[in-house]
Structure formats: structure tokens, C-alpha cells
Swiss-Prot record:
Gene3D superfamilies: 2-enoyl-CoA Hydratase, Chain A, domain 1 (3.90.226.10). The gene is accA. GO terms for molecular function: acetyl-CoA carboxylase activity; ATP binding; carboxyl- or carbamoyltransferase activity. Its EC number is 2.1.3.15. Component of the acetyl coenzyme A carboxylase (ACC) complex. First, biotin carboxylase catalyzes the carboxylation of biotin on its carrier protein (BCCP) and then the CO(2) group is transferred by the carboxyltransferase to acetyl-CoA to form malonyl-CoA. This is Acetyl-coenzyme A carboxylase carboxyl transferase subunit alpha. Pathway: Lipid metabolism; malonyl-CoA biosynthesis; malonyl-CoA from acetyl-CoA: step 1/1. Residues 39-292 form the CoA carboxyltransferase C-terminal domain. The lineage of its organism: Bacteria, Pseudomonadati, Pseudomonadota, Alphaproteobacteria, Sphingomonadales.
Length: 315
């Protein structure tokens, strides 16, 4: 059953009524199909209306929804011949960032992304998608491997940010993030990044300095979380909604600001309500972007990527 967000209470109430009527439908003396159909139409219309006018803070809640597809779901739904690659060849294998070789609609690619996990044990295993230095160094290693063999790189970004623990800082978290960003910019092969949920701070940009940056319709991408921004500006996280609006972190705002290149539409009610449709939509968008980049000379890819990021913030 779908976990409803706080702004979906009316939809939740209608769905409960539908469920109750369905239970009564087992009684052969009752004819309630018409009532169920009317309630389903009302629920669908209400859901469309709500999602057509989501605030940035509400989009943040959708992007964080626990049932939203994660990296492993995209790998299972879009890629064949998946061969995971592990370790940074220096310290450890960070499970917050996964990556490996795969075949995507006929072409060999390198796929790298954040994995948050689905339940408590897996979220602990993947550290809620918050990577440590060894995770970013693993990503660097895989990008270098892709560059060596001429494989396009696809990255799927979904993290609240890099892990801020003392051990991560002692092992060079800032340096690892910077090196990963640098490696993205130095790739001589096509690179397409997609923000599929949260895109938080340097932990996100380290995998997103790509030729083309895509975002799901209800994903968010920012330098800090709304709660963190509110705590700095207003000394309270209670103003997270105001912070989210001020930071322009939605896909629509970022497309207008030319931070991203394309918005991938989500099913009505968010990717968590129809994961297969969302995964297919992302696959189509990735294929189109790779088709546009394939065959371009190395120098052209490098120059275009560099200019893209240097142009950000210019008048």
C-alpha cells in the first residue's frame, strides 16, 4: 500500500473508502461498482490537481518518498548483462555508491549511482545513500575505466549529501568529492547524469558534472537541504518550506536557470506510484541523450562539458 504524504490526506481518505467498498463487494446482494468507479475518478482527479501545483517543499517530500525507485531498480529495469564492480583499490567498497558495466539498449555503458536502500537493514548497508570518500574514489576508478575503453557513462544521482562523519573527513571527503567532479569534467566519452530523487550538495555534483543533466519532474537538486538552509538563515528548521522556495531547487526552476538540460516526466502522483512507467520514461530520455552525444569527438565532448559548467551563473 502506498505511503501517503501529509498533503495527500484527501486522496488517502478516498482510497480508504474505495478499499472499504471493495471489501463490501464480496457480498453478492450489493451492487457498488458504480460507487467505486466514481470514487476512483474523484481520487485520480484530486491527485492530478495536487501534483500539478506542488510547492518546492512538497516536491522535496516526493523526492524523498521511501517507495521511490532506487539505483538497483533502474539497473534491473533498464540494463542487461549487469556486471557490478567493487572497491576503490585503496580503502574499502562503499555500498552507498554502486557501479558496473552493463548493456543499455544495445550499447555497452558504465553505470554509476547512489543507492539508498529499501528497508532498515538495506538502508544501514547503503548508509542511506550518503557516500564516504571510498565511494567517490570507486566512482573515479570506474569513470577512468570507461574512458579507457570508450564506454559512455550514465550516473543516477539520489543522495541527501555526502556522509559528514569524522571518519569520512579524516579520509579526505572534500578531496574525494573534488576529484570525482574533476574526473567527470575530464571524461573523453559521453556522460549523461540523471537526478532521480534527491540531489544534495557536493555529494550530488560529484556524479553530475555531465554533458547532459536530466531531472525527474519531482526530483530536487540543491547545495544544501531545505532544513539545513533554514537552520542557517533562521536558526530553525521549521522554515524549511520557505527555504525550499528560496533555493530554486525544483526541476522546473533549474531548467529555467539552465542548471539542468531536461525534465523527465513522472507518472501522476510521483514515480513511487508507478515505478515501471517512471523507469521506462527515464530509459527513453537517456537513450535520446546518448544518441545525440554518440559519435562526437573527444575534444568536442570535453569542450562542451567545460563550457556548460563555466557558463552557470553568468549574466
Amino acid at each position: 500500500m502506498t505511503a501517503f504524504l501529509d498533503f495527500e490526506k484527501q486522496v488517502a481518505a478516498l482510497d480508504r473508502q474505495i478499499a472499504e467498498l471493495r471489501e463490501m463487494g464480496d457480498d453478492p446482494t450489493l451492487d457498488i461498482e458504480g460507487d467505486i468507479a466514481r470514487l476512483e475518478d474523484k481520487s485520480a482527479k484530486l491527485l492530478r490537481d495536487i501534483y500539478a501545483r506542488l510547492t518546492p517543499w512538497q516536491k522535496t517530500q516526493v523526492a524523498r518518498h521511501p517507495d521511490r525507485p532506487h539505483f538497483k531498480h533502474y539497473v534491473a529495469g533498464l540494463f542487461d548483462d549487469w556486471m557490478p564492480l567493487a572497491g576503490d583499490r585503496n580503502f574499502a567498497d562503499d555500498q552507498a555508491i554502486l557501479g558496473g558495466l552493463a548493456r543499455f539498449r544495445g550499447r555497452r555503458v558504465m553505470v554509476i549511482g547512489h543507492e539508498k536502500g529499501d528497508d532498515i537493514p538495506s538502508r544501514m548497508k547503503h548508509n542511506f545513500g550518503m557516500a564516504k570518500p571510498e565511494g567517490y574514489r570507486k566512482a573515479i576508478r570506474l569513470m577512468q575505466l570507461a574512458d579507457r575503453f570508450g564506454l559512455p557513462v550514465i550516473t543516477l544521482v539520489d543522495t541527501s549529501g555526502a556522509f559528514p562523519g569524522i571518519q569520512a573527513e579524516e579520509r579526505g571527503q572534500a578531496e574525494a568529492i573534488a576529484r570525482s567532479t574533476e574526473q567527470c569534467l575530464a571524461l573523453g566519452v559521453p556522460m549523461v547524469a540523471a537526478v532521480v530523487g534527491e540531489g544534495g550538495s557536493g555529494g550530488a555534483i560529484a556524479l553530475a558534472a555531465a554533458n547532459r543533466v536530466l531531472m525527474f519532474e519531482h526530483a530536487v537538486y540543491s547545495v544544501i537541504s531545505p532544513e539545513g538552509c533554514a537552520s542557517i538563515l533562521w536558526r530553525t528548521s521549521d522554515k524549511a518550506a520557505e527555504a525550499a522556495a528560496a533555493m530554486k531547487m525544483s526541476a522546473q526552476d533549474l531548467l529555467a536557470l539552465k542548471i539542468i538540460d531536461r525534465i523527465v516526466p513522472e507518472p501522476v502522483g510521483g514515480a513511487h506510484r508507478a515505478p515501471e512507467a517512471a523507469i521506462a520514461a527515464l530509459g527513453d530520455a537517456l537513450e535520446q541523450e546518448l544518441n545525440g552525444l554518440s559519435g562526437l569527438p573527444r575534444d568536442t565532448l570535453l569542450a562542451a562539458r567545460e563550457e556548460k559548467f563555466l557558463a552557470m551563473g553568468r549574466a
